[in-house]
């Protein structure tokens, strides 16, 4: 299969059955491999939607720098798209982010502004918003935490793909970062069948897992907790890494791997049948 541009390779990621971890033959566990997106994460979807929305609204100009607070994946996706679409990009991120992510951002031509690691992504958001407010002609912030295009990306792509490939879905479990995946895909699932359970995974307060957040510390405007049926706390991330790598051959990054155990716990302990 050939594509005109790399943008056409975003989305339509496969579902993989995790049969080893479900001792009950009436319960099917599927993982959606968002790492198959060109920049390696689900954030490719929202980056494309936010960029196209900003272009339609006339917010992007060649002389204006796109600025985004990010722990890594959204920034990487925006850096790639900015390079491809002819814009400059600056990632504002905690100094605690990995060297590998910084190198990848620079490889895409992005500038990086590091903020105090103790403040995490929340402080990076404050810094980015302040800079944009003080320099509106120099910077534009797409703001994944407030941007409705984030939710729309999952409502129009992630959700429909899952319904297409797993039409009998009974439970949808996803991590809580910006909340976009849960709000967008979850809304579609509820419209399709109100009985589908939408479950959020969040880290414990003070966790340093990049890409996920405990919503008591900061509640993104696009996220509505009441839209979820319930939430679960993360398990041990080291154990999750080993599980994903050794049993399923998935080289998962930290945010995905740490979601694996609570998702599987739902299936093992609480379901007699389901998908």
Mark where each language-model region is.
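PLP-dependent amino-acid enzyme catalytic core
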Residues: 1-275
């Amino acid at each position: 299969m050939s594509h005109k541009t790399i943008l056409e390779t975003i989305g339509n990621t496969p579902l993989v059955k995790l049969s080893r971890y479900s001792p009950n033959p009436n319960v099917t566990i599927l993982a959606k491999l968002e790492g198959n997106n060109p920049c390696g994460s689900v954030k490719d979807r929202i980056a494309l939607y936010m960029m196209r929305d900003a272009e339609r609204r006339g917010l992007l100009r060649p002389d204006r720098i796109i600025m985004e607070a990010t722990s890594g994946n959204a920034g990487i996706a925006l850096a790639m798209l900015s390079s491809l679409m002819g814009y400059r990009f600056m990632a504002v991120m905690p100094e605690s982010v990995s060297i590998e992510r910084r190198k990848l951002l620079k490889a895409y031509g992005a500038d990086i502004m590091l903020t105090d690691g103790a403040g995490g992504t929340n402080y990076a958001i404050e810094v980015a918003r302040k800079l944009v407010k003080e320099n509106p002609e120099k910077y534009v912030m797409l703001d994944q935490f407030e941007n409705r295009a984030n939710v729309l990306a999952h409502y129009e792509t992630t959700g429909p793909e899952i319904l297409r490939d797993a039409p009998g879905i009974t439970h949808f479990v996803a991590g809580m970062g910006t909340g976009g995946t849960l709000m967008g895909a979850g809304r579609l699932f509820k419209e399709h069948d109100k009985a589908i359970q939408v479950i959020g995974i969040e880290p414990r307060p003070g966790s340093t897992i990049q890409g996920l957040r405990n919503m008591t510390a900061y509640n993104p405007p696009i996220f509505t907790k009441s839209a979820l049926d319930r939430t679960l706390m993360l398990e041990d991330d080291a154990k999750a890494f080993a599980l994903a790598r050794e049993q399923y051959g998935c080289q998962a990054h930290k945010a995905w791997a740490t979601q694996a155990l609570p998702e599987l716990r739902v299936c093992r302990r609480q379901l007699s049948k389901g998908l």
